[in-house]
Design a protein with these regions (language model features):
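Generic structural detector for well-ordered beta-strands
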Residues: 17-21, 48, 62-64, 74, ...
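Hydrophobic-ligand binding "helix-grip"
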Residues: 65-112, 118-121, 150
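Short Pro/Gly-enriched beta-strand edge/turn motifs at strand-loop
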Residues: 1, 42-44, 54-57, 81-87
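Hydrophobic ligand-binding cavity/cleft-lining segments
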Residues: 1-52
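Hydrophobic pocket/interface hotspot
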Residues: 26-31, 37, 61, 75, ...
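Short, P/G- and charge-enriched loop/turn segments at secondary-structure junctions
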Residues: 2-6, 59-61, 87-89, 101
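A short beta-turn/loop motif at secondary-structure boundaries
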Residues: 51-55, 91-92
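A conserved amphipathic terminal alpha-helix motif
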Residues: 112, 118-153
C-alpha cells in the first residue's frame, strides 16, 4: 500500500546575495528598471507594464517566461538607490509571495545585491514545497550571476 503525502500549507524563505564590482548607481539603474528583466533574469521572454506608473510603489508588471507562464507583480515598497519590494498576485502556486531586492555599497566599486522572499504555498506536499524552494533558490542564484556578468563588463 502506497502512503499518499498529505497536502497542506507551507511557509519558507529564500535569500541569495552576490557581490558585484561596479558602482551602486549602475546596479540600481539595472534592477530598478522593473520591465528590464529579460536582460538579466533567466528564462524571461518579456516584461510589460500593467500600470501607468513606471517606478515606485504602485507600479505593476507582467512577466512572461519562456515556458509561457505569466506572473503579475505589484511594487509595494521603494527606497531609491536602496531597495524595492514586490508581491506576486497571479501566476505562482502560492498564497503569498513577497520579495525584496536590495543593494548595499561595500566600497567605492563593490556592491552587495540581496534578493530575498517570503513564500506561503497553496496546498501541496512538503516534498513539493521543498522542491519549489530549491527551484526558487536556483533561479535567484542564476539570475544574480547573470546580473554580475552584465554589470562587470
Amino acid at each position: 500500500m502506497i502512503k499518499s503525502q498529505k497536502k497542506s500549507f507551507h511557509t519558507g524563505t529564500v535569500k541569495k546575495t552576490i557581490k558585484i564590482k561596479t558602482s551602486k548607481d549602475k546596479v540600481w539603474r539595472k534592477i530598478s528598471n522593473i520591465i528590464g528583466l529579460p536582460t538579466w533574469l533567466i528564462d524571461v521572454k518579456k516584461t510589460i507594464y500593467l500600470s501607468k506608473k513606471k517606478r515606485g510603489v504602485g507600479a505593476i508588471r507582467l512577466i512572461t517566461f519562456t515556458d509561457g507562464n505569466e506572473i503579475e507583480e505589484h511594487v509595494v515598497a521603494w527606497k531609491d538607490r536602496e531597495y524595492f519590494t514586490y508581491i506576486a498576485t497571479e501566476g505562482l502556486p502560492l498564497r503569498a509571495y513577497v520579495a525584496t531586492i536590495s543593494i548595499r555599497e561595500k566600497s567605492n566599486k563593490l556592491v552587495e545585491v540581496t534578493w530575498q522572499s517570503y513564500i506561503n504555498s497553496k496546498k501541496m506536499s512538503e516534498k513539493q514545497f521543498m522542491e519549489f524552494l530549491a527551484f526558487m533558490g536556483s533561479f535567484y542564484d542564476a539570475s544574480l550571476e547573470n546580473l554580475k556578468i552584465i554589470l562587470e563588463k
